[in-house]
């Protein structure tokens, strides 16, 4: 098989290593060093996919991260990965890829019918089209939209690859290995600084790889190769290719994704596929270069239309011609450089220059080579469907408003250059306030907020001599400040050709009678007409225009479209671009795989799964287990063919009528000892603790410093200076860390020790109206009467020869006790409870029944204490002391926390007393109100009340106290439910608490 578009003896690929690959089921070949894009172009493949909305044919537009639409589904080593840019994916033996967003094939796509319906699918059509009839949404509209959405297909298989995280520190982090990156890295490293140099591509050098400029006595590429070789030999330098720095965060922390094995057929054993680097740098130099800007004209999305710089890169780096009859459409001298490279390799290009009479050495060189140059000319429209076949061109007036006679010229590619846009993403993410440069018609970094500087083309500097000079100097000055060394390297002379001023023109007007689509965002099919519609419909903020039209919201995040979009809004609104502003640059700069973000945190953690001493008993009695943090707890005890609902309902009902026992070993337990133990409790809890009697327990709430509830639980005074604290299962470790932090760093003067005793004690909660009768038989020598062991009381007893702690505490709303014994005796305790309790019809109950009981009682738990609520929200304001200080007290006085209509925990009952209420559902006043329907609250927990035999829920409701008795609606879009409900007290069962005190 021949490659008709591959040049001999041109490029940087390894022609000694031929690689075979498949695209859309057909076998092709390329070479080591190719990307999938360059190999496909070499084989004459230009149609790679379909656009998102209109399913128009799509080819290649860029040559790297700037690529807006050449994305594929990749298959490697038996696994698949969606939305991979063909311009970034390096070729390897056996690579398989296929087109996305097309059916049944890329050549014949049924979805292309959308292109003929485009008059009905303008910007924002989805906000207007699917509004009526309302009943069609769930049955017709939503399924249709979901099926049409998306590009590639995510794998449903377990990812077998390995990913890693690494943490690194350096004096100087340099992003980009172009001229400015190499110069600053070399200068700083020679002066002793610890340097990390990160390059996104596989090859170092940036634009020097495609430039013929000399640096000193060396070609640009030769100079870059020598500098990189020297840097790699330096012990104070880390050089990374295939590494994208995608996020800049506070305190000079940057995150980088390193692609270690993506270019290999198979990841080496014990090697990661990708590695995420978290880097702290004293100084950061951003040398990320610029992205060439497109020119906007009719059908500018046709395969064969691409950036001029991309065409040059394919030619000089990969030895690939993007066409044999190229048309160069430019408003600056960069297009001439590409045309010259075509001419030197035997291809005759035609240049259309929007400028009237530009003068420069580069233009003179093009003229001397005999290149056909048409000044004051523009491309009206590309002609062709699956590939450019010709172009309609015309002369344009000096004011860029009037077009001359339209001509048609044959061509097989159109290489466009609308000047350059600095890559300012990282600078903006750092907090840098960007500014607009009238000289280059683009935004550049402003004043630094963190320790960062931007150099070279990323800062709007496009002369190599000035770039190298400032970069060498900056690297030296920064390293001198850090290392105190003074080893300054000299920088070489650069002789380069001067360029003419670019033309501030980027969008070709439509000829009369023509309605060509002129695209800005190529992946999402956002055209000039879409921006015009958005502005006509009243959207003025550029952020609103972005979201209404989806401009810049595709997988490329608008790298080639955003600035042209801003220019269009500026022109239509008659505002200067700075007044229009720009959208927010958010990380990541390029897509990052979920695997890399997760790293090694997959599957079960290395932490052992904890099991209570009674676990074997639970297993023997058909317990169905559930993960509760690091513990395995019985969810319910299955009888026969019972399901979860039936089993948990039976268990909860038995607690309400007889007696039940629950394994509560998993609750956090902390021993607090010392003369200042009470003082510690008094500071971390919101209520008073200094006068708690020995043998008494008290319920307490802990807050974070911001006033949000951290945890709740009971603490019992065992003796004079000894307290036993219990926490929720989920927060046990956090509470211990919380106490240790304050004792070590904030109150080191307190004489008190804390230690976790969770695993030292086995616990059983005995609850139900017959629980005292059972307890009396278990502890015949102890007084467990209401007088001998009152509510929130504590005694010690003898359980058939085993010492036990007995707490009268209830989480169920029933008369209840908790019995603790040493863990080694846990199973003995449990078996004795079951044996003695048989006459009282005892049944074990799991976490599901426990949840039902606590919801009926109105006791808040993790779903209410979710890190977003304060004591008032949970009806715990009575525990807030007005006399003493405690952690988080000041924060409770914040305006939002003292609002009169603050949210509150309430009860919710369906009016029909039958329909179960899904957790997470929203509460609204009017289910038929127009969207967005104001949300009044949400359902935090739901159960089937065994007391009243109907559904009951807890909710966090705005102004909940005043809403009791009112009728609202619960709406669950996920379950497609609208449920009329009544708001009631959260204390659904025994609101006066008579049972727990009986």
Give the ranges of each region predicted by the language model.
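Conserved, structured C-terminal
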Residues: 615, 619-620, 633, 719-721, ...
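Structural motif
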Residues: 23, 74-76, 628, 705, ...
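Residues forming the flavin
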Residues: 2-609, 760
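Short acidic-hydrophobic surface loop/beta-edge motif
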Residues: 19-21, 72, 254, 625-626, ...
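Acidic, proline/glycine-enriched N-terminal capping motif
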Residues: 548, 564, 571-703, 708-710
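Residues forming anionic-ligand binding surfaces in small-molecule and nucleic-acid pockets
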Residues: 198, 290, 539, 649-665, ...
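A short, contiguous, amphipathic alpha-helix enriched in charged residues
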Residues: 38-48, 675-692, 773, 777-782
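Well-ordered mid-protein domain cores that form the structural environment of catalytic cofactors
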Residues: 690-721, 726-742
